[in-house]
């Protein structure tokens, strides 16, 4: 397999044809490594708390229909951790990326189907903000707490949905195209799943 199997850079279509070899042999492979590392290491980072407490999400996974929680909670934690490492180095990239993409798609569904509430501040919290807000928060921060924090929660909800969409898309991309030319799959195994 060559580094240009996935995407082609024909000289006839390039404005700077002499750059084709650079793109094929360096820029494209390096971009694959960077993208794989971004997706994989983000999965590892997000899994660390789950690895430290593997049964902590048992109730949550059961609440969305995955029984028994004592199985699914640690399974998903280790899938995210081991899969993240495998994706980052490009080992069995497609199956690990697909498995994590399914998990991330469920996360996306959860964020869309179960939005944050209208407010997160209690009446005591609102009273505190009214008593001495200038000592604690900037005017811009205070604007997020109007109506019990609705503007703040709207921002949190939007970020949760967009990040879930981005990570799901990244994992699906790697599941579809593999780990790229500088991956364990291609360099050592010489095959892809």
Model-derived features: positions:
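Extended, low-polarity transmembrane helix blocks
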Residues: 2-52, 70-78, 82, 89-193
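Short juxtamembrane and helix-loop transition motifs at transmembrane-helix boundaries
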Residues: 54-67, 80
């Amino acid at each position: 397999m060559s580094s240009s199997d996935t995407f082609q850079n024909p000289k006839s279509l390039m404005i700077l044809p002499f750059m084709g070899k650079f793109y094929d042999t360096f820029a494209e492979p390096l971009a694959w490594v960077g993208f794989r590392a971004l997706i994989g290491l983000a999965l590892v980072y997000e899994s660390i708390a789950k690895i430290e407490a593997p049964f902590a999400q048992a109730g949550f996974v059961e609440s969305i229909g995955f029984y028994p929680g004592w199985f699914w909670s640690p399974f998903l934690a280790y899938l995210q951790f081991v899969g993240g490492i495998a994706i980052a180095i490009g080992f069995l990239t497609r199956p690990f990326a697909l498995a994590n993409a399914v998990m991330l798609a469920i996360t996306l569904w959860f964020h869309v189907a179960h939005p944050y509430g209208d407010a997160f501040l209690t009446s005591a919290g609102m009273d505190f903000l009214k008593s001495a807000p200038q000592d604690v928060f900037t005017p811009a921060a205070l604007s997020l707490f109007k109506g019990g924090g609705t503007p703040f929660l709207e921002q949190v909800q939007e970020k949760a949905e967009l990040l879930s969409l981005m990570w799901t898309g990244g994992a699906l991309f790697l599941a579809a195209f593999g780990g790229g030319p500088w991956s364990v799959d291609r360099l050592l195994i010489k095959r892809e799943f």
